């Protein structure tokens, strides 16, 4: 695979290899055959980052070969959304001959939505001034005149210039209901929107007969907690990143959801609060004991759950675990399987043509 060529004819084979690998990894904990969710074979990534290469008068996007570290010119990127591909051409055309925009530019980051909105961030090794702002505003207006719904952001050391805003609003059809998600530049969002829809619908399906409340750790912009709110009396969710918490609060209001409470704190801190080890001012006015959480949802970073959080989640009758790293999932399952059994297993092909796997498990108490 190269940045400009996807081996789409190999999609089925690479997916079958992942299914076999996941089943083998999960064998000590479950004999289940994974439920498999396929990705679109191209144009599935909603975000992408590229370095810029200045080659005389020419300017183009590049990526680096992971093995050789050699640079690869990238004029089209079929893994990315059609909108990113359109913007890649338009941005190069708009920047190449403009000194204020091109000088010391070293990277462009693209974030797009299925609703055809985009944020493009331009990263510089220089101070950004009024000349840059005027040139960027003219470029933005020219792009919009071409029918592109785009926002531009300039970044340099300790500097961030938003011409309008640093977010876009995604609209996803999830189990018969449109969900609105504000996505903030430079914050985590699910990269494969089509796969995200399938993950949300799978999570809804496996929790459809839930009782009581839901606790979610690492909720981000509320991606899962807001979709799952319809299956629970109440949802209590934690997140540490300020921009993600602000986006989650917006998303709660935009989706007219009244049974979700977001707390800004780390999972480790929340564990301490639940266990009565520490008190936190951020929890004033929130009656943790009043929640009847029968289900806990975790979508941890690649490192998985720490040992204290492992112990904490074992106290819940049902654990819904979405993992972007099956190796750390299996490490966590060595502990969790002492008290819970795997009742559902899913493979989400979030990153086609790579070795990366995303998977989901539902664990029920023995």
From Swiss-Prot:
**GO: which molecular function terms?**
rRNA binding; tRNA (uracil(54)-C5)-methyltransferase activity, S-adenosyl methionine-dependent; tRNA binding
Q: What class of enzyme is it?
A: transferase
Q: Where is the active site?
A: 324 (nucleophile), 358 (proton acceptor)
Catalytically driven reaction(s): uridine(54) in tRNA + S-adenosyl-L-methionine = 5-methyluridine(54) in tRNA + S-adenosyl-L-homocysteine + H(+); uridine(341) in tmRNA + S-adenosyl-L-methionine = 5-methyluridine(341) in tmRNA + S-adenosyl-L-homocysteine + H(+)
What keywords appear on the UniProt entry? Methyltransferase, S-adenosyl-L-methionine, Transferase, tRNA processing
Q: What is its EC number?
A: 2.1.1.-, 2.1.1.35
Any one GO BP annotation for this protein: tRNA methylation
Q: Name one GO cellular component term.
A: cytosol
Entry superkingdom: Bacteria
Biological role: Dual-specificity methyltransferase that catalyzes the formation of 5-methyluridine at position 54 (m5U54) in all tRNAs, and that of position 341 (m5U341) in tmRNA (transfer-mRNA).
Query: Per the similarity annotation, which family is this?
Result: Belongs to the class I-like SAM-binding methyltransferase superfamily. RNA M5U methyltransferase family. TrmA subfamily.
Q: Which NCBIfam families match?
A: trmA_only
> Which HAMAP family does this one have?
RNA_methyltr_TrmA
| Name of the protein in question | tRNA/tmRNA (uracil-C(5))-methyltransferase
State which gene encodes it: trmA
């Amino acid at each position: 695979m190269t940045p400009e060529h996807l081996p789409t004819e190999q999609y089925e084979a690479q997916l079958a290899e992942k299914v076999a690998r996941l089943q083998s990894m999960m064998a000590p904990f479950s004999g289940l055959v994974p439920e498999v969710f396929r990705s679109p074979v191209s144009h599935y990534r909603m975000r992408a980052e590229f370095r810029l290469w200045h080659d005389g008068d020419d300017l183009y996007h590049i990526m680096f070969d992971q093995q050789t570290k050699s640079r690869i010119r990238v004029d089209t990127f079929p893994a990315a959304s059609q909108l990113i591909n359109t913007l890649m051409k338009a941005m190069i055309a708009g920047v190449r001959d403009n000194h204020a925009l091109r000088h010391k530019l070293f990277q462009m980051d693209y974030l797009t939505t299925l609703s055809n909105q985009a944020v493009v961030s331009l990263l510089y090794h220089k101070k950004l001034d009024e000349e840059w702002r005027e040139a960027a505003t003219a470029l933005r207006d020219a792009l919009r005149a071409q029918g592109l719904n785009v926002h531009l952001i300039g970044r340099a050391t300790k500097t961030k210039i938003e011409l309008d805003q640093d977010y876009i609003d995604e609209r996803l059809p999830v189990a018969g209901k449109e969900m609105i998600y504000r996505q903030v530049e430079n914050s985590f969002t699910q990269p494969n929107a089509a796969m995200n829809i399938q993950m949300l619908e799978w999570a809804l399906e496996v929790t459809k007969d839930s009782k009581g409340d839901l606790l979610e750790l690492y909720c981000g912009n509320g991606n899962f907690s807001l979709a799952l709110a319809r299956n629970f009396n109440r949802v209590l969710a934690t997140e540490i990143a300020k921009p993600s918490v602000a986006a989650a609060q917006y998303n709660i209001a935009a989706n007219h959801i009244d049974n979700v409470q977001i707390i800004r704190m780390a999972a480790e801190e929340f564990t301490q609060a639940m266990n009565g080890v520490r008190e936190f001012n951020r929890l004033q006015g929130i009656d943790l004991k009043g929640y009847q959480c029968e289900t806990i949802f975790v979508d941890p970073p690649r490192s998985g759950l720490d040992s204290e959080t492992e112990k904490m989640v074992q106290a819940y009758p049902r654990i819904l675990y979405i993992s972007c790293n099956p190796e750390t999932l299996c490490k966590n399952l060595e502990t969790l399987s002492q008290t819970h059994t795997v009742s559902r297993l899913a493979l989400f092909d979030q990153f086609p043509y790579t070795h990366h796997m995303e998977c989901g498990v539902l664990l029920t108490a023995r």
